[in-house]
Structures are given as structure tokens and as C-alpha cells.
């Protein structure tokens, strides 16, 4: 007899090795799957692969009328089972096809659209109905017929510049999307000569330029770096070619009025390793964190300087600025070791060190670089701002590149977190750090919840810095669904509204709040077209008779 709502569920006997943590496995879960485990950075292993729309998403609380724009998130999610190379057992969590989630806020309502970025890689595999690509950034593990295609999945970040909405991943150039339908429109819209473009370009609040770089800019495992600035009209106005000290993983950067500062992680790409079927990247405990300072508008690579610190990973920056002494100040997350254990070291000795060290310590810190000093100088130890695992810091982007006060940071909430987890797998809250006041407020997402990178929307165009709303996706692990929480920065500890999706979406890597004012045709177009004011049935077919 099937259990009623008041009865305990009927237990199904399964081998202990296959039992889920809650002790019950549904019979269909015992059937073989063509999908390998495909984890994201948060540790989730379930592909979602959803494309579609939701009109007027269900909301708890009240959406502030001041929210006028779109909250975009981009996520890695495999459109096809990633089994081509070794059954997918070596797949990296940062790989997977880019899929964009868009929450459109207007007049206190929210519509939702989700769609894959139709990259060349996506189109190849969609036509084939199977996986054709192997390891992350290793074409030697791809099917021979696709090795000369651009294998970027455009899954890392989005930005709006010069009226163009871009989806980006650092192993290729950007794809352009329609900001309303999310249809893919083209590749490399600014015609950059580099083979690659960072997923973390910065929009200068002073000049309006999009400032960025590409690394491995002339091909696999090359040390070539390309610096560029694109003005608000879409024209490249500054560019410079330079070389990194080694072929390093250069994910994020910091911007000041006079410098672009690159952060080199201690990984190294090696062509021989790739040809042998190994990973693009290997962590190296003998290499230091390295910073490259590029004077904005520089005409010669001789103007570029390098700086070093200990081993570790400054993963993402909040922002950068210059103090009254001309020193560069950068606030960033910092992991004291390898935060990407899926790219282990080459040597057995270093692999043993990674294993024995366990989960590396993570913090939010402040770096100081004096660009007047000689190149190749070791930096002083950074100042610790938050001594708790911290990642994905964001600011009020109206102050990008200049001195700022407020930072919004993904954190492990003190006393409510498991500090033994990888920094990406225990982020259960947000911190509002007020630099000038020296204070920190905490928002806790709730039990059995993880929270993703925040974004900030100012209360008005002329609102004081940090006065507005923070939005972030909360993964409700207990309910297997996702929701956007909205926090008023005037009372940071409590959400004022939650936009509740009826399902879970993948853990995103990055996202942006794009105001309606800078989105082309924002008022005339929506994420979802409204039905035409034309009825299929004439009034005579209605059951209502106005004469009765």
C-alpha cells in the first residue's frame, strides 16, 4: 500500500554504498545515466539545462519601485553530457556551456528569461547531439574535427558597453547577445586583435572606457598579454602588447585613474602537458602571487612593472584606487593556497602538499603597491579586512576606479559556517563593509542555504555611495529551488523581498545589475512579449449576456 500523507515513507533496500545521505534512493535513481558528475564551483552536481521564460515571477515582500533594470547572472551548465574525453571524469567546474539568467525589474514586477549562449562550441554539439570537446582549454583532448573552433563557452561574466551586451570567458573573445531575448548576435564585436579577452573588464567611472586585457593573447601557453581600452562609442582608443613573466592564470584585475593592475595566479600552462592529455593548468607552490602594473595609455611595454608576494590566490578584486601619496590600493579576496584543487600541481611532492594542507585559509584583504618603486619588488603583507572566508566582492560601480567606501562581499557568516569547506562551497551570507567607518554588517541567507555573488543598484542616480539595494541569488538547498533576495542597504541584516523561482538554477560565476537607462529599448521591449490586443473569439461566443 502506498504511504498516505501521515505515514512514514516506505524504505527501499539499497546497497549502503549507493544510499543517499538521507538513507533513501528512489528506484529510478538506480538506473544507469549517460551523464557524468558535472559539479559547479558550489559543489552542486545536477545539470539544469533549462531554457524558457516566466512572466511575473512570484514575489514575497515588496519590490522597490526604484529597481529599474535587469539583474543578469551567467552560469556554466553543460548542454550535452560532457563525456567525450575519459567519460568526463576530469571535467573542471568552471567549464560548461554559458547560460544567462535575466531578471527584469520594472514597476515593482519581475519577469524571467534563461537561455544558452549559442557559441560555436554550443552549436557544434547541438547539431551533433553529443559531446565533442574534452578538457578545459585543451584542444588536444577535443574531437579532431573541432580543434580549430573557438572553444570558449562564454560562461563567466556579462557587461553592457557601447550599447552592446556581452557574454565573456577568458579563453576567447566576447559574444554579443540581445539584452532582451538573449539571442546570440555575434563574436568579438569590438574587433580586438587578441585571441582572448578577460571576463573582468572594468568600466571606468571617470572616462566611461571599458578597460581590459587578454592573456595567452597569441595562442595556447603563450606569455603574450594585450591591454586595451574601448571608449563609450565602441572605439579602441588605447592598446599595448606585453609579456607576462610566465604563462599564468590571469583572471581578474583592478583599475585606478592611472593604472590597470593584473593579478597572476601561481598556475602555469604547459603545451607538453596538454598534448599528453593533461590539464591546461597546474598549480605551483613555488610561484608567488604576481601583479603587473600597466600605466593607462602606455605606449611601451618598458613602462610596465611587476610585483610579487607569497604563494596564494587573490581571486577577485572589489576595486582599486590611488591614495594621496600616489600608491595603488587594491582590496581583494585572498586564498592562502590552491582554491582550484581540480587543477592540481604536476609533481607528486606538490600534490601531496595540496592534500596534506587541506582547505586553505581565505580572507578579504587590502594590498598596497607603490608604482614609483623599482620593478620586481616584494609587496608588504596585505592588511586583513575580514578574517573569514570571503569571495566575489562588489562595489557601487559608480565609483569604479576611484576611492570607494562600501563593499558587498560573499562570506562564510562567522559562527554560522563550516570553515573546513572550500571557499566556494560554504558561502552562506553577505557582508557590507564600510571602509571609511570601519564597520561590517552581516546578512545570513538561512539554514541549508548558499548565496551567490551580490550586485548593487543605487537608490537613485544621485544617491550617496552604497545607498540602494543589494540583490543576490539564494540557493534553497532544502527546497531545491533558487530565489533572488533584495536587501535595502539601510537595514542590511534583513531581506525586504524575495523573487522565487519554482526551480533551482546552477550556481553562477558572475553577474551584473544593468540599469534600464543604459539598456537599449528598455521601455519598449521586455524579456517576454505581451500578447497582442486581439481576441481569438468574438464577443458573441461569450457565455455572458449583458441583456440578462
Swiss-Prot record:
Effect of deleting the gene: Does not affect biotrophic development, nor virulence.
Key words, A-Z: Dioxygenase, Iron, Metal-binding, Oxidoreductase
Protein's name according to its UniProt entry: Resveratrol cleavage oxygenase 1
Positions that bind Fe cation: 200, 251, 316, 510
InterPro entries: Carotenoid_Oase
Record's function text: Dioxygenase that cleaves the interphenyl C-alpha-C-beta double bond of resveratrol to yield 3,5-dihydroxybenzaldehyde and 4-hydroxybenzaldehyde. Also cleaves piceatannol, a compound that differs from resveratrol only in the occurrence of an additional hydroxyl group, which leads to the production of 3,4-dihydroxybenzaldehyde and 3,5-hydroxybenzaldehyde. Exhibits a high degree of substrate specificity, as suggested by the lack of activity on carotenoids and the other resveratrol- related compounds.
Family: Belongs to the carotenoid oxygenase family.
Positions contributing to trans-resveratrol binding: 136, 169, 391
Residue sites binding piceatannol per the record: 136, 169, 391
Reported cofactor(s): Fe(2+)
Record keyword Metal-binding present: yes
Pfam families: RPE65
Highest taxon listed in the record's lineage: Eukaryota
Chemical reaction(s) catalysed: trans-resveratrol + O2 = 3,5-dihydroxybenzaldehyde + 4-hydroxybenzaldehyde; piceatannol + O2 = 3,5-dihydroxybenzaldehyde + 3,4-dihydroxybenzaldehyde
GO MF annotation, one: metal ion binding
Cofactor note: Binds 1 Fe(2+) ion per subunit.
PANTHER family from the UniProt entry: BETA-CAROTENE DIOXYGENASE, CAROTENOID 9,10(9',10')-CLEAVAGE DIOXYGENASE 1
Enzyme Commission code(s) on record: 1.13.11.-
Coiled coil feature spans: none
Enzyme class per UniProt: oxidoreductase
Record GO biological process: carotene catabolic process
Amino acid at each position: 500500500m502506498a504511504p498516505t500523507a501521515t505515514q512514514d515513507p516506505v524504505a527501499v533496500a539499497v546497497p549502503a554504498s549507493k544510499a543517499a545521505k538521507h538513507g533513501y534512493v528512489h528506484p529510478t535513481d538506480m538506473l544507469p545515466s549517460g551523464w557524468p558528475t558535472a559539479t559547479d564551483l558550489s559543489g552542486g552536481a545536477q545539470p539544469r539545462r533549462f531554457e524558457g521564460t516566466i512572466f511575473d515571477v512570484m514575489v514575497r515582500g515588496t519590490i522597490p519601485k526604484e529597481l529599474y533594470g535587469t539583474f543578469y547572472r551567467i552560469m556554466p551548465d553543460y548542454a550535452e553530457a560532457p563525456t567525450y574525453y575519459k567519460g568526463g571524469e576530469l571535467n573542471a567546474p568552471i567549464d560548461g556551456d554559458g547560460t544567462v539568467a535575466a531578471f527584469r525589474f520594472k514597476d515593482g514586477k519581475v519577469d524571467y528569461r534563461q537561455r544558452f549562449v549559442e557559441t560555436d562550441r554550443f552549436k557544434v554539439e547541438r547539431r551533433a547531439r553529443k559531446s565533442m570537446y574534452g578538457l578545459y582549454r585543451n584542444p588536444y583532448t577535443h574531437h579532431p574535427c573541432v580543434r580549430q573552433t573557438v572553444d570558449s563557452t562564454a560562461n563567466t561574466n556579462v557587461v553592457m558597453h557601447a550599447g552592446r551586451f556581452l557574454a565573456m570567458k577568458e579563453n576567447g573573445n566576447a559574444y554579443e547577445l540581445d539584452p532582451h531575448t538573449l539571442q546570440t548576435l555575434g563574436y568579438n564585436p569590438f574587433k580586438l586583435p587578441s585571441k582572448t579577452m578577460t571576463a573582468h573588464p572594468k568600466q571606468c567611472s571617470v572616462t566611461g572606457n571599458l578597460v581590459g586585457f587578454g592573456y595567452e593573447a597569441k595562442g595556447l601557453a603563450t606569455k603574450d598579454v594585450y591591454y586595451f581600452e574601448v571608449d563609450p562609442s565602441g572605439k579602441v582608443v588605447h592598446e599595448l602588447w606585453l609579456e607576462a613573466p610566465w604563462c599564468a592564470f590571469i583572471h581578474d584585475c583592478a583599475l585606478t585613474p592611472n593604472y590597470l593592475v593584473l593579478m597572476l595566479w601561481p598556475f602555469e600552462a604547459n603545451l607538453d602537458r596538454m598534448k599528453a592529455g593533461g590539464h591546461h593548468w597546474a598549480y605551483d607552490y613555488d610561484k608567488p602571487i604576481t601583479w603587473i602594473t600597466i600605466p593607462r595609455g602606455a605606449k611601451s611595454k618598458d613602462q610596465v612593472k611587476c610585483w610579487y608576494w607569497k604563494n596564494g590566490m587573490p581571486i577577485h578584486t572589489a576595486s582599486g584606487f590611488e591614495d594621496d601619496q600616489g600608491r595603488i590600493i587594491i582590496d581583494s579576496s585572498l586564498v592562502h593556497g590552491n582554491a582550484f584543487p581540480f587543477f592540481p600541481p604536476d609533481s607528486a611532492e606538490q600534490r601531496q602538499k595540496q592534500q596534506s594542507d587541506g582547505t586553505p585559509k581565505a580572507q578579504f584583504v587590502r594590498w598596497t603597491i607603490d608604482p614609483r618603486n623599482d620593478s620586481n619588488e616584494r609587496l608588504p603583507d596585505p592588511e586583513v579586512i575580514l578574517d573569514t572566508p570571503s569571495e566575489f566582492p562588489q562595489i557601487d560601480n559608480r565609483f569604479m576606479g576611484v576611492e570607494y567606501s562600501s563593499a558587498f562581499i560573499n562570506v562564510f557568516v562567522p559562527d554560522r559556517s563550516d570553515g573546513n569547506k572550500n571557499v566556494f562551497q560554504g558561502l552562506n551570507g553577505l557582508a557590507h563593509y564600510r571602509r571609511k567607518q570601519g564597520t561590517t554588517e552581516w546578512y545570513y541567507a538561512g539554514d541549508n542555504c548558499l548565496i551567490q555573488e551580490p550586485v548593487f543598484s543605487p537608490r537613485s542616480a544621485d544617491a550617496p555611495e552604497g545607498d540602494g539595494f543589494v540583490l543576490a541569488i539564494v540557493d534553497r538547498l532544502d527546497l531545491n529551488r533558487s530565489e533572488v533576495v533584495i536587501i535595502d542597504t539601510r537595514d542590511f541584516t534583513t531581506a525586504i523581498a524575495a523573487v522565487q523561482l519554482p526551480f533551482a538554477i546552477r550556481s553562477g560565476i558572475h553577474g551584473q545589475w544593468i540599469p534600464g537607462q543604459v539598456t537599449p529599448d528598455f521601455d519598449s521591449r521586455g524579456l517576454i512579449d505581451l500578447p497582442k490586443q486581439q481576441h481569438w473569439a468574438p464577443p458573441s461566443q461569450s457565455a455572458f449576456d449583458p441583456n440578462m
